[in-house]
Curated annotation (Swiss-Prot):
Residues the entry annotates as binding ATP: 251
Short name of one Pfam family: Anticodon_2
UniProt name for this protein: Glutamate--tRNA ligase
Catalytic activity from the UniProt record: tRNA(Glu) + L-glutamate + ATP = L-glutamyl-tRNA(Glu) + AMP + diphosphate
Keyword Transmembrane appears in the UniProt entry: no
NCBIfam families xrefs: gltX_bact
Function: Catalyzes the attachment of glutamate to tRNA(Glu) in a two-step reaction: glutamate is first activated by ATP to form Glu-AMP and then transferred to the acceptor end of tRNA(Glu).
Amino acid sequence: MNIETLFPLDPNVKVRTRFAPSPTGYLHVGGARTALSSWLYAKHFNGEFVLRIEDTDLERSTPEATAAILEGMEWLNLAWEHGPYYQTKRFDRYNQVIDQMIEQGLAYRCYCSKERLENLRHEQEANKEKPRYDRHCLAHHDQPTDAPHVVRFKNPQEGSVVFDDAVRGRIEISNSELDDLIIRRTDGSPTYNFCVVVDDWDMGITHVVRGEDHINNTPRQINILKALGAPIPTYAHVSMINGDDGQKLSKRHGAVSVMQYRDDGYLPEALINYLVRLGWGHGDQEIFSREEMIELFDIHSVSKSASAFNTDKLQWLNQHYMRSLPAEHVAKYLAWHMNDQAIDTSSGPALEEIIPVLSERAKTLKELAAASRYFYQEFDGYDEKAAAKNFKAEAVAPLAKLLEKLTALTDWSVEAIHDAMNATAADLEIGMGKVGMPFRLAVTGSGQSPSMDITAKLVGRERTLARIQKAIEFIQAQA
């Protein structure tokens, strides 16, 4: 039987991995961790990474889910050399191989009715036998080929399947445990396990990195590969991810979709760094650049145990990357959140200017965007607790004096604003807090903000002066 390559298989490429999601939902963090592991392993060996969309489940697969998977992969910057390939576009190839297998006695048509199979199962269960097909149709060829039927793979009945899992070590399954797998349904469509085998063969996949929920599929797929005379990839089955409570990660734990983390304000660098550390590490190192991940990652060092998802650790990493990445880079992602929160940034400081100022307090870009609103928009009122404390009648004098000094400035710089604040405190013989706190509330509407000399510089001269005047009038109106 001959391979049918989809792209030139470079003999110099020693490692070719793939990520093969089913488009029945969004790209979740478990899938993203698997994709990352597969991608890193390929990159470590200067290999190739293939993206394949396993959309044979026609009832559950949707174009929306496919688009979401591609969007998630692109957001994480997990670029692929080949693909995306769609299984639904390769049905002719799968059926060609199945027909050849029938001709060579590697597969056979099964005409058994649902009733017969149901009765067989009940009989086997009553006899405390493992339910499996009894090969009735292998011995009976008296049916016309156009009668309704499925096609079954003729699984070996003797011996066992042995493979060395890169994560879990040696695994052995007796062939007596395996059934004659259906590889083509009655409607003529090939089944998942068969399509995967042909794809891995045609795409020259050398290493299959996937979730532990696929372990049971592996011996079945290996037997089909052997029957085809195809090379057997190395398999690596990574463990599942649990929530903070030790239970399997699900929607009740919050975000599980990759793009939900984008929406919640996380940088892709933070999520990638966090995912690579789930079940793998390099000493005590917590922060990894992408180049370091590629250099150091080893699939053989991934833990067999389930990993617990820790949102606090992800937030810590996110804040680190918000502070340490170039502001111009972070600004590209922050712009999405500004738009999402309907903050018009056309009149105000550049996003690159506010990121270093606000990232000390915000853990996510979503929080940072919300905290930046006063740089770009007027606010309707003042924080009640802060106003009760800092907008008493005696606050009018320092605000008025500060307004006078700021109005006189010819240089609207951080240093000049800071000097004006100091001079106001000195002139009135009061502490800096008596100047700074009313000033902060007047300009930001809040009792918390970065240093006011920096804040006022970014808010701008006209807005700052107008807001101080508005605050003075507000205090006087309350008296």
